[in-house]
Swiss-Prot record:
Name of protein: Trk system potassium uptake protein TrkA homolog 2
Cited function: Part of a potassium transport system.
InterPro entries attached to this UniProt entry: K_uptake_TrkA, NAD(P)-bd_dom_sf, RCK_C, RCK_C_sf, RCK_N, Trk_Ktr_HKT_K-transport
Binding site for NAD(+) 2: 232-262
Domain of life according to the entry: Archaea
UniProt comment concerning the protein's domains: The RCK N-terminal domain binds NAD and possibly other effectors. This is expected to cause a conformation change that regulates potassium transport.
Example GO molecular function: potassium ion transmembrane transporter activity
Organism the protein comes from: Methanosarcina mazei (strain ATCC BAA-159 / DSM 3647 / Goe1 / Go1 / JCM 11833 / OCM 88) (Methanosarcina frisia)
């Protein structure tokens, strides 16, 4: 398959990086620094304006997907519109799916939508995608990440093992998991471990668990984290991300939501649109204000202003003053590990949320769902096994799997199975695989 990515900034670079694992990718960019960085990838680089008709016409033949993710909404929309006009003038060319990154709430009010009538098959809003991701994390109090697969039959959750967790120092075989759950991977510092029974659990490990949703709901007890129950939530910053997230939380009858916003006019505007939340005009770094609002009693503090440094400071203050769990927005991808290194429970990125959404929409043949983990170091991928797949019809022990990839779950009809070496995958089975990013291309070949 062939893909065009317009814009090689934070978002475009990472989309091109991942698409290049399964697609032939062309990157269009006019910034010299971004061009040099994109040139490090296994992609073709074209210098120029991605909305230019001549440039688009030169790359469009045989393109399956065009993704416009520059930092300017109008450029992204015009690029998609122009591509569709060019395709109409060349009916023999392959039909191209167009995807545009759009942030302005005047254009989009949901994370993902379609504007096919103007030439944009899919619009994605990074800020709203991020808000949805945070809301998903809030619905699973002890988890730092969560995704559904196989139409809701399989769930992935990632847990951070705190130093005081009762599992620290124990072996994997000592974890009492139900038969329908499996620990797929452990992230430890910069290492990724495919665990075995005699592996020890260490403080600050991140553990990826896959299983049936019913069993996953009980994992809070297994992992021993004192998970908050979404009751008392303080949201700092009510821009696009904050407001969309506030709307989601505001509908939860069990949530007691307070919002801190420094712009008085925005406070008045938001107060008229939220029914249950308490809106406070102030600065999220004001220690006196935080103390007045009893931050030590907060179950969750979420800092989602448009400024990474302010989010970091707000989060550190909240943590120091006793908040149970802190979530912070980090627009710069290199800040995410830094935030977590200094004690922020969860760092979330609009860029990563957007990459996840684009990858879901550009998945290759046979791929039903996909989620990136730990800053895109690994992926959980759901495939449907076709009759031609190399993985079908023989025991798993006889299949040469690439290093860094394992089959975690198989859904056969309505049965969810943790496969062993003698298990045989059949045509039509849904196969959930954990794979390091370096192993994804090799895994793809097994399903062709």
């Amino acid at each position: 398959m062939k893909a065009v990515v317009i814009g090689a900034g934070e978002v475009g670079y990472h989309i091109a990086k991942f698409l290049s694992l399964t697609h032939d990718v062309i990157v269009i960019e006019n910034d010299e620094d971004a061009l040099r960085r994109a040139d490090e990838l296994d992609v073709q680089v074209v210098e120029g304006n991605g909305a230019n008709a001549d440039i688009l016409a030169s790359v469009l033949p045989d393109v399956d997907i065009l993704v416009a993710v520059t930092g300017v909404d109008e450029v992204n929309i015009v690029a998609c519109m122009t591509a569709k006009l060019i395709l109409r003038a060349h009916p023999g060319w392959k039909e191209t799916k167009t995807i545009a990154r759009v942030s302005n709430p005047d254009y989009i009010d949901v994370p993902v939508t379609s504007r096919a009538q103007v030439g944009v098959d899919i619009m994605i809003c990074p800020e709203l995608a991020l808000a949805s991701e945070v809301a998903e994390v809030l619905s699973n109090p002890s988890a730092i990440d969560a995704e559904m697969f196989a139409g809701g039959k399989v769930q992935m959750m990632e847990f951070a093992i705190r130093p005081d967790n009762r599992l620290v120092g124990k072996r994997m075989q000592d974890i009492e998991l139900e038969d329908c759950c499996i620990v797929s991977a452990i992230f430890r510092n910069n290492d990724i471990i495919i665990p075995h029974g005699d592996d020890f659990i260490k403080a600050n490990d991140h553990m990826v668990v896959v299983g049936k949703p019913r069993a996953m709901a009980d994992l809070e007890n297994v992992f021993g984290n004192e998970g908050p129950h979404r009751n008392r939530i303080l949201l700092i910053g009510c821009g696009i991300v904050g407001f969309y997230l506030a709307k989601i939380i505001d509908k939860d009858e069990n949530a007691d939501l307070k919002v801190i916003e420094y712009r008085k006019s925005r406070c008045i505007e938001v107060a008229e649109m939220l029914e249950n939340a308490l809106i406070l005009n102030g600065d999220g770094t004001d220690v006196n204000l935080l103390r007045e609002e009893n931050i030590e009693d907060m179950d969750v503090v979420i800092a989602v202003t448009d400024n990474d440094e302010k989010n970091l400071l707000c989060s550190l203050l909240a943590k120091q003053m006793g908040a149970k769990k802190v979530i912070a927005r980090a627009d710069r991808s290199d800040y995410v590990p830094l935030f977590e290194m200094v004690g922020i429970d969860i760092a979330v990125s609009p860029r990563e949320a957007t990459v996840n959404e684009v990858l879901k929409l550009t998945m290759g043949k046979g791929i039903e769902a996909l989620a990136t983990i730990e800053g895109e170091k690994a992926e959980i991928i759901e495939y449907t096994a076709s009759g031609q797949s190399k993985i079908v019809g023989k025991p798993l022990s006889k299949i040469k799997f690439p290093k860094g990839a394992i089959v975690t779950m198989v859904v056969h009809d309505d049965d969810v199975i943790i496969p062993r070496g003698e298990f045989i995958i059949r045509e039509g089975d849904r196969v959930i695989i954990f794979a390091l990013s370096s192993a994804v291309r090799s895994v793809e070949k097994l399903f062709k």
